Amino acid sequence: MSLRCLYLDLDGTLLGRGASMLHDGEGRVSIDGVRAIQACLRGDVEVVLMSGRRSTQVQEDARLLGQSSYIFEGGACVVLEGEAQWLTGELQPGEMTIAEQIERSGAPGMLLEHYSGRLEYHEPWHTEREVSHLFRGLLDVAEADRLLAECGHGGLRLVDNGVVSRRSEALAELPHVRGYHLVPASASKAGAVAFHRRARGYAREETFAVGDSREDLACAAEVGVFWLVANAISRDPSIAAEIAAHDNVRVADGANGTGVYEAVVATLMTG
């Protein structure tokens, strides 16, 4: 069966240091990410970017790759041929954005107060978001989700988006810092991948995905093959324990764009 679509994460996966497509994770010049996209386009494989980034950012990145569909804010919305499909359950944009509705609920403030010294907004990327509230820090996501439910915010969940490099002095004592998205409970990258795949009429076996986080890894349930880039393991060894839950996950030898190129070539050759 021929391959028809790649679902591809941006930060920490296709992009290297400084969110550059032309540099690896160490800042060295690399065109492997470009070669990966080129291989897909030559093979008539659609590339759907999936990211926690804001819509305007992912839209421009998709346009630069010649693609008309993309997934933004951690799966909260799928844009298909220019039409937004919100996967946010009862929370829908209207007079207020979904992010404003979440703010009004009090959930973000509750989390910041409860996890004082362990959680803060991920400045400067936390503004102008349509859906999610973006934090950084270090906490137990399962515990945070239980706290949300106990405080009447069961319609929301906190998503672990992996290790991040920036922090303020308030978090200086933490051993490392992770990025977190507060989103409607129904929003996920896996759900967005499933929606797009059904809309396009792709069989699961006709698709594959590449990423670097637990949220990305959950997409394995919706694609034929899922690849983790090598830096996913080196930056967060604990993610390796979750691979066993899937029988279609492979780990690339290469990091960032080099790992993406490895995944694309290997999958196209065997697909």
PLM features per residue range, with description:
Residues 4-23, 49, 220:
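Asp-based phosphoryl-transfer active-site loop
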Residues 14-27, 177-184:
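Glycine-rich phosphate-binding "P-loop"
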Residues 86-105, 159-178, 237-244:
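Charged, glycine/proline-rich intrinsically disordered loops and linkers
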Residues 23-27, 47-49, 185-186, 205:
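Short, flexible loop segments at the rims of nucleotide/cofactor-binding pockets, characterized by
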Residues 2, 30, 183-185, 190-271:
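Mg2+-dependent phosphoryl-transfer enzymes with acidic/Ser/Thr/Gly-rich catalytic loops
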Residues 113-222:
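Conserved acidic, metal-coordinating active-site core of Asp-based
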Residues 28-125:
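Active-site phosphate-binding/coordination module
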